[in-house]
Design a protein with these regions (language model features):
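Short beta-rich binding modules
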Residues: 1-238
Length: 238
């Protein structure tokens, strides 16, 4: 399975990564050295949307899992901004592309998935089971710095009438990756421009201190809806 569908388009600028945005464990916000231990494709059961499931090994032998959707329900890696009318990349696609670049120096579409079998939780069996996946081996075992934020959000439950997941009254703490850097501390855009001095990671650390918490429940209560992942307003992926 080639990743040609993730090719970048002429006329769409790379924007998301250099902006300061608003597992089984929760860590404080900050920038952490990490190793990629898994990176495999996941196809939506209900549409053409595709995600990349990442597993990162963090300090103190902690593990961070993040599922990043790189295309929408139509299989596109971009959307049309309602205000400007111009196309823009999906935030998930940009984040995954940046992970690929800061770890390999390659664009996401240039990577070649390989067939692997790994243990993944099977909801029908209610346990982990050997599952064939398309693994991005170019990324596996590479190192980077992940910029993480602690988040408070509503727990979700499946609405039996609609089949969709909706917010409940309960809240939970979780972590989200909002930016990535190469092991030298440069973002993908900085690396591409051959920056010589660290800049963005310094600003990132000033904002995302250990005390930083993004409370999604406040915005959701005000709007009466859930907030999109990664703090960027985009149309539904599905």
């Amino acid at each position: 399975m080639a990743l040609d569908f993730l090719q970048k388009k002429a006329g769409i600028g790379e924007t998301t990564q250099d902006k300061i945005g608003g597992g089984s464990f929760i860590i404080n916000s900050g920038a952490y050295p990490a190793k990629v231990t898994k990176a495999y494709l996941q196809q939506s059961n209900s549409s053409s949307a595709v995600a990349i499931v990442f597993e990162f090994k963090l300090p103190d032998d902690k593990t961070l899992n993040e599922t990043i959707w790189v295309t929408n329900g139509k299989g596109e890696n971009f959307y049309v901004d309602q205000k400007s009318g111009k196309p823009a990349y999906l935030p998930g696609f940009e984040l995954a592309s940046n992970i690929a670049y800061v770890t390999t120096g390659k664009e996401l579409a240039a990577l070649t998935p390989e067939d692997k079998v790994i243990e993944i939780y099977n909801s029908e069996l209610k346990k982990k089971a050997p599952t064939p996946v398309k693994m991005l081996m170019d990324i596996v075992d590479t190192e980077l710095i992940v910029g993480i934020q602690k988040v408070v959000e509503f727990k979700q439950a499946k609405n039996q009438a609609t089949g969709k997941y909706e917010d409940t009254a309960e809240t939970r703490e979780t972590n989200e990756i909002v930016n990535v850097f190469n092991i030298a501390g440069f973002t993908a855009l900085e690396a591409k421009s051959e920056a010589k001095e660290l800049d963005f990671i310094i600003k990132f650390k000033e904002v995302y201190t250990a005390e930083f918490v993004r409370d999604k429940t406040k915005k959701a209560k005000a709007a009466g809806t859930t907030t999109p992942n990664q703090g960027v307003t985009t149309p539904s992926l599905f």
